[in-house]
């Protein structure tokens, strides 16, 4: 029997502080719960949306019930007895970090049980010898930033000076990351990508998970904005991924939409499609669901929940984007084929109501839909790897080293 898997990952969509949140300074974080609370109390009203958070299709897959199991609290405005069509669980992260790469790798069978390298100093964040080597190897004459920063704020603060000098802007965050912002037209995309490649080679021995190209456009601080030509340079996964097993054992197609290919350093990816906005990500995902052949795994990362709303602590924007996604989810459900397995999940939290601008250590929702799957609670997962192990079971692949299968199909041999 030919099968397909569709994974929709809502980047940063946590459902409540996990039991180890205190170790990360994240007690009280709850991305979904705090957005729902703000909406219910009319604190997230805008020209685009008003009132309680309305996510009927996500609720039908078990989102609210998953959050209830994780936190003992139903998100405000959610149904206690929705018309349930999906099977649901919630998962804690086994990996040592709360970043994008750790979450994604873990769910495909490669939890990060080592410590990434970090730049912990808020100012003068990068070692001088590293900066000197980057300058020597790339021939840049100087740099700006060298600090922890919000990506949107630092281009406002330093973008005009960058245009005067063409010095790239270097910055980091609480994640294992080295980010480089330049003007896409004045500095040039090819020059930015070449700079990032050199920086990645220099930083890889320090276990810095990613170097990220962050191009922007505009003439002054009032109109600087980032473009869709972001590119991530990631360390290769340290363990074999589910993707590779699928290709080896079933000659499967692994279709990346959005930044998935970059996150996995292009390991085990057979096709990739870029998209610049939440609408485009939904459009391309729907197109692939309609057209991808059997024996395919379609994997989309919906990055804007994290980059545009979580990190920017924009509760109303996050809520509006969720409601837009939920409306598009109806289209996705309507276009699934007979034997498709749909999975909705996240990679970490990024509570827009929480202090700071960083990710938050939270449980994630794990929601499944398949015509032969009984709507039910599937339990608490001790690792995101249960997602990959469940996919391996569904596709008839060799088991992963981590995780347990959550699925039990009606009439499956």
UniProtKB/Swiss-Prot annotation:
Cofactor note: Binds 2 manganese ions.
Cytoplasm among keywords: yes
One GO cellular component term noted in the UniProt record for this chain: cytosol
Compartments, record wording: Cytoplasm
Enzymatic reactions: 2-deoxy-alpha-D-ribose 1-phosphate = 2-deoxy-D-ribose 5-phosphate; alpha-D-ribose 1-phosphate = D-ribose 5-phosphate
Keywords for the protein's UniProt record, in alphabetical order: Cytoplasm, Isomerase, Manganese, Metal-binding
EC number: 5.4.2.7
GO biological process: 2-deoxyribose 1-phosphate catabolic process; 5-phosphoribose 1-diphosphate biosynthetic process; metabolic compound salvage; nucleotide metabolic process
Cofactor(s) annotated in UniProt: Mn(2+)
Keyword DNA-binding: no
One annotated GO molecular function: phosphopentomutase activity
Binding residues annotated for Mn(2+) 2, in chain numbering: 306, 311, 359
Pathway assignment: Carbohydrate degradation; 2-deoxy-D-ribose 1-phosphate degradation; D-glyceraldehyde 3-phosphate and acetaldehyde from 2-deoxy-alpha-D-ribose 1-phosphate: step 1/2
InterPro entries: Alkaline_phosphatase_core_sf (IPR017850), DeoB (IPR010045), Metalloenzyme (IPR006124), Phosphopentomutase_DeoB_cap_sf (IPR024052)
Binding site for Mn(2+) 1: 11, 347-348
Family assignment from sequence similarity: Belongs to the phosphopentomutase family.
NCBIfam families the UniProt entry points to: deoB, PRK05362.1
HAMAP family linked to this entry: Phosphopentomut
Biological function: Isomerase that catalyzes the conversion of deoxy-ribose 1-phosphate (dRib-1-P) and ribose 1-phosphate (Rib-1-P) to deoxy-ribose 5-phosphate (dRib-5-P) and ribose 5-phosphate (Rib-5-P), respectively.
Name of the protein in its database record: Phosphopentomutase
Lineage: Bacteria, Pseudomonadati, Campylobacterota, Epsilonproteobacteria, Campylobacterales
């Amino acid at each position: 029997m030919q099968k397909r898997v569709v994974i929709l990952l809502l980047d940063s969509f946590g459902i409540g502080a996990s039991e180890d949140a205190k170790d990360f300074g994240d007690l009280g974080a709850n991305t979904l719960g705090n957005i729902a609370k703000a909406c219910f109390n009319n604190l997230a009203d805008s020209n685009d949306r008003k009132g309680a958070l309305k996510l009927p299709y996500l609720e039908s897959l078990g989102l609210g019930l998953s959050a209830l199991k994780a936190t003992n609290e139903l998100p405000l405005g959610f149904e206690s007895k929705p018309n349930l069509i999906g099977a649901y669980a919630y998962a804690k992260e086994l990996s040592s970090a709360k970043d994008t790469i750790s979450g994604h790798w873990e769910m495909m069978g490669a939890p990060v049980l080592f410590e990434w390298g970090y730049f912990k100093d808020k100012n003068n964040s990068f070692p001088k010898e590293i900066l000197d080597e980057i300058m020597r190897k790339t021939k840049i004459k100087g740099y700006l930033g060298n600090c922890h920063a919000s990506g949107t704020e630092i281009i406002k603060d330093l973008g005009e000076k960058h245009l005067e000098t063409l010095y790239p802007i270097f910055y980091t965050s609480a994640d294992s990351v080295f980010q480089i912002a330049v003007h896409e037209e004045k500095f040039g995309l090819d020059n930015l990508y070449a700079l990032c490649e050199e920086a990645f080679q220099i930083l890889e021995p320090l276990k810095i998970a990613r170097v990220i190209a962050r191009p922007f456009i505009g003439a002054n601080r009032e109109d600087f904005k980032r473009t869709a030509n972001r590119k991530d340079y990631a360390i290769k996964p340290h363990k074999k991924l589910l993707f590779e097993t699928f290709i080896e054992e079933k000659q499967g197609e692994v279709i990346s939409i959005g930044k998935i290919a970059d996150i996995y350093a292009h390991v085990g990816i057979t096709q990739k499609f870029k998209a610049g906005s939440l609408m485009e990500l939904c459009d391309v995902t729907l197109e692939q669901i309609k057209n991808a052949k059997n024996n395919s795994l379609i994997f989309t990362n919906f990055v804007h929940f994290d980059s545009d709303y979580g990190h920017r602590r924009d509760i109303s924007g996050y809520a509006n984007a969720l409601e837009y996604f939920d409306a598009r989810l109806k289209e996705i459900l309507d276009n699934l084929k007979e034997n498709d397995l749909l999975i909705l999940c996240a990679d970490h939290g990024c509570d827009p109501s929480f202090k700071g601008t960083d990710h938050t250590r939270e449980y994630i929702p794990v929601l499944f839909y398949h015509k032969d799957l009984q709507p039910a609670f599937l339990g608490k997962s001790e690792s995101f790897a249960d997602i990959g192990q469940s996919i391996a079971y569904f596709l008839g692949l060799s088991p992963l080293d981590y995780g347990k299968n959550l699925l039990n199909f009606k009439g499956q041999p």
